[in-house]
Amino acid sequence: MSDINATRLPIWGIGCNPCVGDEVTALLTRGEA
């Protein structure tokens, strides 16, 4: 998950909100998978 978050966060510009970034990453992962 660390690698995914590190890749997702900068793209969405949610580096200042790790908690939100984690939720967004989970939603994206579920949507793609």
From Swiss-Prot:
What InterPro entries does UniProt report for this protein, alphabetically?
Amanitin/phalloidin
- Mind listing the GO molecular function terms for this protein? toxin activity
Keyword field contains Plastid:
no
Modified residue annotations for (3R,4S)-4-hydroxyisoleucine = 11
> What post-translational modification information does the record give?
Processed by the macrocyclase-peptidase enzyme POPB to yield a toxic cyclic decapeptide. POPB first removes 10 residues from the N-terminus. Conformational trapping of the remaining peptide forces the enzyme to release this intermediate rather than proceed to macrocyclization. The enzyme rebinds the remaining peptide in a different conformation and catalyzes macrocyclization of the N-terminal 8 residues.
Write the record's keywords in alphabetical order, separated by commas: Hydroxylation, Thioether bond, Toxin
Similarity section? Belongs to the MSDIN fungal toxin family.
Q: Explain the purpose of this protein.
A: Major toxin belonging to the bicyclic octapeptides amatoxins that acts by binding non-competitively to RNA polymerase II and greatly slowing the elongation of transcripts from target promoters.
What name does the UniProt record give this protein?
Answer: Alpha-amanitin proprotein
- Which species does the entry assign this protein to? Amanita fuligineoides
Record gene name: AMA
